[in-house]
Amino acid sequence: METSAPRAGSQVVATTERHSAACRADPLRVSSRDKLTEMAASTQGNFDGNFESLDLAEFAKKQPWWRKLFGQESGPSAEKYSVATQLFIGGVTGWCTGFIFQNVGKLAATAVGGGFFLLQLANHTGYIKVDWQRVEKDMKKAKEQLKIRKSNQMPTEVRSKAEEVVSFVKKNVLVTGGFFGGFLLGMAS
């Protein structure tokens, strides 16, 4: 006696076909889930013995590390990790950034200061002659150009980047707070 119940997996194929059709509209966004659904759909009615089983453990091992960490669609980290994990990740990355920033800043300040010192020494000993009238003339010209370009509106590129940063901070408040706290600790150490 035959029943009219759908075959096992037919509902999954129907929902995944809708998802893969939506994702196929964007050619840059091709995920491994889409590949799996296409493979499943193409072999759905073909059980003549020519099919290959898929070992999900092996498939997961072949995925890049960033896919495992961020998932298919990396959204706000607040949805993925606990509060403590977010603060820890933000704090550690902030501390590392602050520590590196402090050490590189010292090196850069030493290099710039040493360069100015050598230029002053060369000027004092007569190796370099500075035409101060020409410097003053160029400074006046630069001031005039700045006055001409001065406006109260930000360029659209700057505005769009600022909006992106604000959106990121709003979505990831804990990670951002941990980062800034860690950055300050890294600068102090």
Curated annotation (Swiss-Prot):
Membrane topology: Multi-pass membrane protein
GO biological process: autophagy of mitochondrion; intracellular triglyceride homeostasis; regulation of platelet activation
Cysteine pairs bridged by disulfides in the record: none
Keywords annotated in UniProt: Membrane, Mitochondrion, Mitochondrion outer membrane, Nucleus, Phosphoprotein, Transcription, Transcription regulation, Transmembrane, Transmembrane helix
Segments on the Mitochondrial intermembrane side according to the record's topology features: 102-107, 186-189
Any GO MF annotation of the entry: phosphatidylinositol-3,4,5-trisphosphate binding
Source superkingdom: Eukaryota
Chief location: mitochondrion
Transmembrane segments: 81-101, 108-128, 165-185
Topology, Cytoplasmic side: 1-80, 129-164
InterPro entries membership: FUN14
Annotated localization: Mitochondrion outer membrane; Nucleus
Annotated GO CC locations: mitochondrial outer membrane; nucleus
Keyword Membrane: yes
Modified positions (Phosphoserine) in chain numbering: S10, S53, S151
Family membership noted in the UniProt record: Belongs to the FUN14 family.
Function as written in the Swiss-Prot or TrEMBL entry: Binds directly and specifically 1,2-Diacyl-sn-glycero-3-phospho-(1'-myo-inositol-3',4',5'-bisphosphate) (PIP3) leading to the recruitment of PIP3 to mitochondria and may play a role in the regulation of the platelet activation via AKT/GSK3B/cGMP signaling pathways. May act as transcription factor that regulates SREBP1 (isoform SREBP-1C) expression in order to modulate triglyceride (TG) homeostasis in hepatocytes.
The protein's name: FUN14 domain-containing protein 2
Source organism of the structure: Macaca mulatta
